[in-house]
Amino acid sequence: MKRFIIKGPNKAIKGEVNISGAKNSCLPLMAASILFKNKVILKNVPFVKDVLTMKDLLVSLGAEVDISEKKKMMTITNKKNHKLVVPYNLVSTMRAGVLTMGSLLARYPQKKIKVALGGGCALGVRDTSWHLAGFKSLGVNNSLNKGYVNISSKNGLIGSKYKFPKVTVTGTSNLIMASVFVKGTHYIKNISIEPEVIDLINFLNNSGTDIKFLGKRSIKIKGVKELVNGIHTIIGDRIEAFSYLCVGAITNGKIKINNIDPTNLRSEIGILKKIGYKIESNDNSIKLISSKKLKPIKLKTGPFPNFATDNMPLILAVLTTIQGKSQIEETIFSNRYMAAPELNRMGAKIIIKKNKATIIGQKKLNSADCISSDLRTTFSIILGAIAANGSSKISRIYHGLRGYYNLE
């Protein structure tokens, strides 16, 4: 699949969507399977491109992976020791490959491990320095050679203390996994509390780890000898959920999202209400109902529970169709506004200055030929296209397949 052709504008879209399991939860859970000497069974698995790439990575390391797309289930079996080299060809398009560092370290702390630096979306600085600093607090030595991080610990992993300089999702997950078998207790401060990180912690604790919160962003991990009962149902994907809420919003429709915990989208729901959309929710679903009285807003992205940076390109597209001046401040990634020039090709008026965007909303967009550059930009352009007059062609649609199941 090379491109989408979308004919707009779409009339008010109405209906229900059953949300997939969270890709950003599934990937670290798959990496965590390395910690187990027996089977790990994951349910509600989203079989998107990144998940299939991670499957291939685990197989390359020596695991057996059986999947049932119909049942949305994956079984990972570790019958033998893993290979300790994570190759570049399997992480070049997927940053989550870096998460194997923590789990491989925990299983094989005194062995030499080589992990290629990965890819993913080109959103700005996303280095591994905080991951490696966290590992160092456990007694790990590291070096960089020809694009590979080399890590090992002569004396094994010993619990101590570490505080992340800034909240990092993958850094938190990596250090948690590295710490599950430590000698003693490891204390970690300023961790990410994204729903996907909490999902990982719940999975590990249900499998025998001893991870306790000492405060909102502080935990202690008491080392254990082994993990058991690796069975887990993945949480619903909050980014996919918000994507489809935005489909309803930008078409003045009415849409219900199932298989999602509304508390994982508390900031996003608050923003939609401020704009003027009516939101109804219960424990496992969210319904958006459009309104004729919509107004521009100001928002700022940030670590959970703030407005998610992944959802910013989506609301950006919606705001281009709401009359008035809206403002966005992006605090996580330097290149998160990749959708702006493509939306401007459709007639949107988005002005970018450093990490801030000013959106002069208007009622109509026009079709255009656009190029996708990353996962969330893809869906942002799709949102623009379904609201635009005429047929829009979107190239490099493969970026969207990394994170959206059955996008077509």
Q: Regions from the language model: what does each represent?
A:
Residues 1-408:
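Short, structured segments at the rim of ligand-binding sites
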